[in-house]
Amino acid sequence: MFSARLVLVFAVVLCIQLCNASWLDERAMTQEKRCNGKYQKCTSNSQCCDQKDYAKRKLRCLTQCDEGGCMKYKQCMFYAGTQK
């Protein structure tokens, strides 16, 4: 039959594998792709969250401008113009 030492080694190896598996799952969850919400900086539309406002407008990566000029960076905002 199996010796006590062999059973102990098997138990330790199994424990190490289970610990590594749970650590990898936690790491994968933290590296999950995150999206940017309203008014957060972005560089492309794909970085903005896939959410819609009350008028069913999607978040887009846009440069905000007013009479004084435009901002130097883009933000995720709901586009008020026509969308297809």
Curated annotation (Swiss-Prot):
Protein family per UniProt: Belongs to the sea anemone type 5 potassium channel toxin family.
Compartments it resides in: Secreted; Nematocyst
Q: What is this protein called?
A: Toxin NvePTx1
Expressed in which tissues:
In unfertilized eggs and early post-fertilization stages, is expressed uniformly. In gastrulae, the expression becomes spatially-localized and seems to be absent from the oral and aboral poles. In planulae, the expression is clearly observed in the ectoderm in packed gland cells absent from the two body poles, and upon metamorphosis, the expression diminishes. There is two types of gland cells, one large and elongated and another small and round. This toxin is maternally deposited at both protein and RNA levels.
Which N-terminal residues, if any, form the signal peptide? 1-21
Species of provenance: Nematostella vectensis (Starlet sea anemone)
- Primary role: Neurotoxin that is probably only defensive. Acts as a voltage-gated potassium channel (Kv) inhibitor. In vivo, induces a rapid increase in swimming speed on zebrafish larvae, as well as death which occurs between 2 and 18 hours later.
The beginning of the lineage is:
Eukaryota, Metazoa, Cnidaria, Anthozoa, Hexacorallia
After translation, the protein is modified as follows: Contains 4 disulfide bonds.
Q: Does the keyword Signal apply?
A: yes
Kindly indicate whether the keyword Secreted belongs to this entry.
yes
The UniProt keyword set, sorted, is: Cleavage on pair of basic residues, Disulfide bond, Ion channel impairing toxin, Nematocyst, Neurotoxin, Potassium channel impairing toxin, Secreted, Signal, Toxin, Voltage-gated potassium channel impairing toxin
Alphabetically, the GO molecular function entries are: potassium channel regulator activity; toxin activity
